[in-house]
């Protein structure tokens, strides 16, 4: 089933006639790649999520949504985009959240990842409400760098503030609804 948007704007052109700069998507190749991801989901039971930060061509979300489980966002605006344009699983992670955004995030997201236990505790009252269906998780910093010479950009490097390192984990995890 073709997206209405894609069908409406489907244009056949010679490559040499395409005005530049522009974004051109080869729908056949995209579908081939999406079928690989769909097979991965079927074979493993995992959920493949579109990282909107890497690819936010939302006109293709209906097509992409036919093959994968949903989207992942880095904040309120991407979370809204994923909810509105794909309408499937919607996950969000941000190093920090604003109080005014959390009320909407728990309504439009299925899973919200926090950067620390303190951050989760600040917002846990949203997850304890009976009507809340979103789940929460903690970002783990595995402290396992895979690169050398770029420590400043390494989210797992020494001094990174992204995620909880082993030494910051309590002996016993808190008894509220949270995942890792």
Predicted feature residues:
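Active-site-proximal beta-alpha core segment in soluble small-molecule metabolic enzymes
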Residues: 46-180
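Generic N-terminal amphipathic, Lys/Arg-enriched alpha-helix
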Residues: 12-24
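Short, Lys/Arg-enriched N-terminal segments with co-localized hydrophobic residues
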Residues: 1-12
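A short, N-terminal amphipathic alpha-helix
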Residues: 33-43, 81
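Eukaryotic alpha-helical scaffold "rod" segments
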Residues: 19, 44-45
């Amino acid at each position: 089933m073709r997206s209405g948007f894609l069908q409406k704007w489907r244009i056949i052109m010679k490559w040499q006639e395409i005005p530049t700069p522009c974004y051109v998507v080869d729908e056949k190749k995209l579908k081939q790649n999406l079928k690989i991801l769909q097979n991965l989901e079927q074979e493993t039971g995992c959920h493949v999520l579109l990282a909107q930060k890497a690819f936010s061509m939302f006109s293709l979300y209906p097509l992409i949504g036919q093959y994968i489980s949903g989207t992942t966002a880095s904040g309120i605006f991407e979370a809204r985009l994923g909810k509105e344009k794909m309408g499937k699983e919607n996950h969000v992670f941000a190093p920090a959240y604003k109080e005014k955004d959390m009320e909407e995030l728990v309504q439009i997201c299925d899973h919200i990842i926090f950067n620390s236990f303190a951050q989760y505790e600040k917002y846990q009252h949203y997850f304890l409400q009976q009507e809340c269906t979103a789940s929460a998780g903690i970002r783990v910093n595995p402290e396992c760098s895979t690169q050398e010479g770029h420590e400043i950009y390494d989210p797992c490097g020494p001094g990174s503030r992204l995620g909880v390192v082993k030494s910051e984990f309590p002996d016993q995890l808190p008894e509220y609804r949270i995942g890792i």
